[in-house]
UniProtKB/Swiss-Prot annotation:
The keyword Cytoplasm applies. Interacts with UvrB in an incision complex. CDD domains: GIY-YIG_UvrC_Cho. This is UvrABC system protein C.
Length: 658
């Protein structure tokens, strides 16, 4: 293990984090003016690719920026950043010095896109954004892109609510995290409710209460909804909770313990018992921290393990000396890169979604640590230190992270071997020519034909690919026909695939289509694909067998009418059931969301220019959508948040004739 002295990375100049909308890059970089696009043939040709790059180099200057290699279809092969674009891109023209991985990339390159930036730190941030967006095959990829949960203590109510939060941090309040998983957040919130008796209900539920709910009865809430606690006393509980989550857990415990002894001396045994239970909850939270990090404070800890060409990165999240969970990541496309390059790319992508700690501990010296720290300054709100711990609590914590990384990689490799064996057996059972790399599973969901939709989930060798999930709102007038729904979904899915990728080069054509259903669904799918002239996509329908409830058996229907079954203890059966259950879960969830939107729909939604915030303001002011419709132009103009132009738009919508 190579070690380096601890190093403080200062923010020499705050890096401005570029914001990239989902549909295109920000115009601030003037990509259209900076882009250089040179087209060539679509067959792999290293001389042709190198020629494209040489012509691009002639247009470049030694300025910082980001470059993209594109193939003949315009798909992104690679995203890179550079302090001096001209020098960096020129390196790719020396093909004899490139590793095999980059030689393959150059042979496929048919155009380049260049974006200049104000600094190398800004280029690093944009590079991470573009890698996350395009997922190029020659970049290191952070495959686990699920957002991290936080604990939110709201700051916009007299009696703040504690809750789990994911996504953009728009709500006013204090955020604590990240936590490694939803489970760790839920466990912590449950313990915090026992400790501080804070409410977890939403504001509407609280406003409607006329008596305490069950949480008050089991001593997990102080019932501010019905006045069982004053605003001042509740504020004291909130203050203690903030101190506890902010790293002052010892002081909070001592404070509660002193209050408990005082209550006992005053013979207030009921209050003493309540404080005793709160103290136990505090002890439970600290005892549940599998890692002792009292001497670390706030830090993110990363350690890497490599074996057999695979990589694992173990992350620990330490806040206030408490371990808020850990998670293992398995970056892909790491062939031919140094461990330091993999770690740097991983961290840049990781902090695209997660606010960085002011202290980032890594298990190896990173050549671009200063650059990365500078780029993360703005998101962290100040200096970011990236260092390799040498001694003390930090070193012990890093050693534990390293052990966890090795164990995680060993488990991953063992699971991959088992999974590969199951996939080979699955291919054999379903009579496929080779192990499928992309399996699409389909299901429909509706209630007596209402809010009908079709759903597709995608599975691959590494599991489910959630970014590829799709759903379709059924357009048929008569949607109580499951078979017709399945025909529509297949027609729309594969009709579009034929238009966009007729040569099947994008990797988005399935090696197997698995249908949740029986003979009827199979016939509908065959008919739909036959009308499109598609006869070479393997099809299988999975239906509950006659003894499903007792034995868990399933019947598999093939296009030629044959039926097959698997032993009840077969790993292949279990794998196929998991796939079927996943599409069922996704379809049901999407249907519920669609039904919920339909139930809560308002006539105001149809008015152009009226968003959720303005709709709420109108309903609060007038009471109902009907009263908004009946309001005069003058009444609309007096409503809060409604300008004269918006008032005129609303009035004209309901009174088209004037």
């Amino acid at each position: 293990m190579r070690r380096a002295p601890e190093r403080l990375s200062a923010c020499h100049a705050m890096a401005r984090k570029p914001q990239t909308p989902p549909d295109r890059e920000t115009e601030r970089f003037h990509e259209e003016r900076a882009a250089t696009t040179l087209r060539g043939a679509d067959r792999p040709d290293i001389e042709l690719g190198a020629g494209v790059i040489r012509e691009t180099v002639q247009t470049l200057k030694p300025k910082p920026g980001v470059y993209r290699m594109l193939d003949a279809r315009g798909d992104v092969l690679y995203v890179g950043k550079a302090r001096a674009l001209k020098n960096r891109v020129a390196n790719y023209t020396q093909v004899e010095r490139l590793p095999n991985r980059l030689r393959r990339m150059v042979s496929q390159t048919r155009s380049m896109t260049i974006v200049t930036t104000n600094s190398e730190a800004e280029a690093l941030l944009l590079e991470a954004q573009l890698i996350k967006r395009f997922r190029p095959p020659y970049n290191v990829l952070l495959r686990d892109d699920k957002s991290f949960p936080f604990i939110l203590l709201r700051g916009d109510h007299a009696f703040p609510r504690i809750s789990k939060h994911r996504g953009a941090r728009k709500a006013k309040g204090n955020y604590y995290g990240p936590f490694a998983s939803a489970g760790s957040v839920n466990t912590t919130i449950n313990a915090l409710q026992k400790l501080f008796l804070l409410r977890s209900c939403n504001d509407g539920f609280m406003a409607r209460r006329d008596r305490p709910c069950l949480l008050y009865q089991i001593r997990r809430c102080s019932a501010p909804c019905v006045g069982r606690i004053s605003e001042a006393d509740y504020g004291e509980l909130v203050r203690q909770a903030k101190d506890f989550l902010g790293g002052k857990s010892g002081a909070v415990q001592r404070e509660i313990e002193a209050q408990m002894h005082k209550a006992a001396e005053d013979l207030d045994f009921e209050r003493a018992a309540m404080l005793r239970d709160r103290l136990r909850a505090a002890t439970f939270i600290q005892g549940s921290q599998a890692i002792n990090a009292e001497g670390v404070g706030n830090a993110d800890v990363f350690a890497m393990a490599t074996k057999g060409g695979q990589v694992a990165v173990q992350a620990f999240f330490i806040r206030g000396g408490q371990n808020w969970g850990h998670r293992a990541f398995f970056p892909s496309h790491t062939e031919g890169l140094s461990e330091e390059e993999v770690m740097t790319s991983f961290l840049a992508q990781f902090y695209e979604e997660v606010p960085p700690a002011r202290l980032i501990l890594v298990d190896r010296a990173l050549p671009e640590a200063d650059l990365l720290a500078e780029a993360l300054c703005e998101a962290a709100g100040g200096k970011v230190e990236i260092s390799v711990p040498q001694r003390g609590d930090r070193r012990r914590l890093m050693e534990q992270a390293q052990r966890n990384a090795v164990e995680a990689l060993d488990r991953r490799m063992a699971e991959s071997g088992t999974k590969a064996k199951v996939m080979r057996e699955l291919a054999e059972f379903l009579e496929l020519p080779e192990v499928p790399q992309r399996i699409e599973i389909y299901d429909n969901s509706h209630i007596q034909g209402t809010n009908a939709l079709g759903a597709m989930v995608v599975a691959g060798p590494e599991g489910f690919v959630k970014g590829q999930y799709r759903k379709w709102n059924i357009k048929l007038a008569q949607t109580n026909d499951d078979f017709a729904m399945m025909r529509e979904v297949m027609t729309r899915r594969f009709g579009r695939a034929q238009e966009e990728d007729p040569d099947r080069e994008s990797g988005n054509w399935p090696d197997l289509v698995l249908i949740d259903g029986g003979k009827g669904q199979m016939s509908a799918v065959k008919e739909a694909l036959g009308e499109l002239g598609i006869e070479d996509v393997p099809l299988v329908a999975i239906a509950k067998g006659p003894h499903h409830g007792r034995e868990g058996r399933e019947v598999f229907h093939f296009p030629d009418g044959r039926e097959k079954m698997l032993p009840v203890n077969s790993p292949v059966l279990f794998q196929l059931q998991v796939m079927r259950d996943e599409v069922h879960r996704f379809a049901i969830g999407a249907h519920r969301a669609k039904r919920s939107r339909a139930i809560t729909a308002s006539p105001l939604d149809e008015i152009p220019g009226i968003g959720p915030a303005r709709k709420r303001a109108l309903l609060l002011h007038f009471g109902t959508a009907g009263k908004v419709r009946a309001a005069s132009l003058e009444d609309l103009q007096r409503a809060p948040g409604v300008s004269a132009a918006v008032a005129q738009t609303i009035y004209d919508f309901y009174h088209p004739s004037g």
